Regions:
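Rossmann-like adenosine-cofactor binding region
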Residues: 98-175
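Phosphate-binding beta-alpha-beta segment of Rossmann-like dinucleotide-binding domains, i.e.
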Residues: 11-67
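An N-terminal-biased, well-structured beta-alpha scaffold segment characteristic
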Residues: 1-13, 141
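N-terminal Rossmann-fold NAD(P) dinucleotide-binding loop
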Residues: 77-78
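Gly/Ala-rich phosphate-binding loop of Rossmann-like dinucleotide-binding domains
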Residues: 81, 85, 172
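Short beta-strand "acidic-cap" motif of Rossmann-like dinucleotide-binding folds
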Residues: 91-93
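A short helix->loop->beta-strand "cap" motif at the edges of active sites that frequently abuts
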Residues: 8-12, 88-89, 150-152, 174-175
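Glycine-rich Rossmann-fold phosphate-binding loop(s) that bind the pyrophosphate
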Residues: 73-74
């Protein structure tokens, strides 16, 4: 939040809230596709002129009709929800205030008494698109990581503090 000294000194503040939402949402989609199809492996194979795909790659099922959890329904999260609908994905969302939203199949929220872990347990993808504050710091912690499917992908489009990094490392090593 803005410090009183800013106003006392007559400094003009402007905001471009939402201006980058389309690009950030596209970025999230790029990460989702890259993770789904193991883009680094495909790029290495192409560089090495290996045209036969591995059995593991050929068994990948894509994003079509999978479930995505959008955590934070601001402008970026809402745009992510809109874009993933082109893959006929089921969109679950977590937002502290919202009761319903366009392009979202079901909205969960703390003010409604919902449990974030219930949403996470259903998701093949989780996209974090919320601001970092006292309520969202480590919103993804050991309990949330444990609630997620072992095959789920986590895409953090917000600040690093949204995820408890040591808990994530532990979950990746032993989960």
């Amino acid at each position: 939040s803005t410090k009183p000294e800013v106003f006392e000194r007559g400094i003009i503040l402007t905001s471009s809230s939402g201006r980058s939402a389309p690009a950030l949402a596209e970025h999230a989609l790029m990460f989702m596709l890259s993770l789904t199809y193991d883009l680094p492996m495909l790029m290495r194979a192409q560089k090495e002129h290996k045209w036969a795909v591995s059995r593991e790659y050929s068994e990948k099922t894509g994003m079509y009709r999978k479930t995505v959890g959008v955590i934070g329904l601001g402008m970026t999260g809402s745009e992510v929800a809109r874009l993933v609908k082109s893959f006929d994905m089921k969109v679950l969302a977590w937002d502290r205030r919202r009761k319903e939203a366009q392009n979202v199949d079901q909205v969960y929220g703390a003010e409604n008494g919902d449990n974030l872990n219930e949403l996470l347990a259903q998701c093949d993808y989780v996209v974090l698109s919320l601001e970092l504050n006292d309520q969202t710091f480590h919103i993804i912690d050991a309990a949330q990581l444990a609630a997620m499917k072992k095959t789920a992908f986590l895409v953090n489009m917000g600040r690093g503090g949204l995820v408890n990094e040591p808990a994530m490392i532990e979950a990746l090593k032993h989960g």
